[in-house]
């Protein structure tokens, strides 16, 4: 049995100390890191509970339950941040990416502890693939929220649409992973390639301007 709450405490403890020592400008980054790992921990409990209640098999839990729960849990702190602090667009995007990054990091650490780290090539591809998938979902949601929350009429519909887009991409990724074989490595490569393509497009647009 993997006691993920103990892992959470071990990882978060130095982050809390660092957050107290750093200035106010860096505090936001550490807080969103802690929040991202916290929602990952809560997502694991909720996924397990819903899988037991629905009597879902491994495939259903991975492709149907986990993407919905995890993307909703990652969205909730961002909505709270938007409602309470009303941040600027660039801060929303940075917060979404930080939460997604911390979520992916904690998920990868728990996976390594539970399954071992002896297969370097597999762990390498999984680390990049899972990290890029969560970051890409964060980019979708964060970039979209920065746009939709500037327009009152788009807030609710836009947020729901962005959440559905992130869930769909996450579910597709998990489904390919669960299928195994070549599809698994396609899943690992897909988010990395999409992030790279997005950054290249952004760079070309900035060069034209």
Question: Model segments located where?
Answer:
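Hydrophobic alpha-helical segments at protein termini of multi-pass membrane proteins
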Residues: 1-209
């Amino acid at each position: 049995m993997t006691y993920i709450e103990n892992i959470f405490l071990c990882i978060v403890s130095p982050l809390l100390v660092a957050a107290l020592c750093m200035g106010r400008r860096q505090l936001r980054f550490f807080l969103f890191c802690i929040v991202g790992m916290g929602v990952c921990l809560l997502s694991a409990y909720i996924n397990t509970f819903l899988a037991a209640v629905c009597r879902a098999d491994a495939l259903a839990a991975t492709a149907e339950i986990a993407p919905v729960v995890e993307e909703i849990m990652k969205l909730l702190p961002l909505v709270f941040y938007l409602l309470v602090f009303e941040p600027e667009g660039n801060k929303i995007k940075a917060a979404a990416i930080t939460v997604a990054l911390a979520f992916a990091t904690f998920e990868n650490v728990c996976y390594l502890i539970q399954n071992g780290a002896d297969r370097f090539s597999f762990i390498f591809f999984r680390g990049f693939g899972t990290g890029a998938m969560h970051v890409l979902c964060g980019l979708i949601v964060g970039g979209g929220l920065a746009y939709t929350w500037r327009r009152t009429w788009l807030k609710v519909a836009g947020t729901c649409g962005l959440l559905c887009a992130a869930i769909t991409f996450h579910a597709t990724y998990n489904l390919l992973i669960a299928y195994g074989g070549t599809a698994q490595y396609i899943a690992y490569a897909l988010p990395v390639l999409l992030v790279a393509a997005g950054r290249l497009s952004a760079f070309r647009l900035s060069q034209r301007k």
